[in-house]
């Protein structure tokens, strides 16, 4: 599987500090029993970053989220 980078995640969430908070929150959720939203055999933090990059995990404030291009086009059309 390809490597995940902060830049991949910043396509969805601009703020690096928010990105770190989201990843930490997601890791805590895994430890509470939540299931990952993407298939991954990586460590928890890498799985959390993969979820963020895939747009599966959103910040609490939707204004801070940049949807994938195809999703944004569908919203603008509808």
From Swiss-Prot:
GO terms for cellular component: DNA-directed RNA polymerase complex. GO terms for molecular function: DNA binding; DNA-directed RNA polymerase activity. Keywords: DNA-directed RNA polymerase, Nucleotidyltransferase, Transcription, Transferase. Signal peptide: none annotated. It is an enzyme of class 2 (transferase). The keyword ATP-binding does not apply. InterPro entries: DNA-dir_RNA_pol_omega, Pol_omega/Rpo6/RPB6, RPB6/omega-like_sf. GO terms for biological process: DNA-templated transcription. It catalyses: RNA(n) + a ribonucleoside 5'-triphosphate = RNA(n+1) + diphosphate. The keyword Nucleotidyltransferase applies. Its EC number is 2.7.7.6. Gene3D superfamilies: 3.90.940.10. Promotes RNA polymerase assembly. Latches the N- and C-terminal regions of the beta' subunit thereby facilitating its interaction with the beta and alpha subunits. The RNAP catalytic core consists of 2 alpha, 1 beta, 1 beta' and 1 omega subunit. When a sigma factor is associated with the core the holoenzyme is formed, which can initiate transcription. Belongs to the RNA polymerase subunit omega family. This is DNA-directed RNA polymerase subunit omega.
């Amino acid at each position: 599987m390809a490597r995940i980078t902060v830049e991949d995640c910043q396509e969805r969430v601009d703020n690096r500090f928010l990105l770190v908070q989201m990843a930490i929150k997601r890791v805590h959720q895994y430890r509470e029993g939540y299931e990952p939203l993407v298939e991954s055999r990586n460590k928890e933090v890498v799985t959390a970053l993969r979820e963020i990059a895939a747009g599966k995990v959103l910040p609490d404030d939707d204004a801070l989220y940049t949807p994938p291009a195809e999703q944004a086009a569908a919203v603008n059309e509808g």
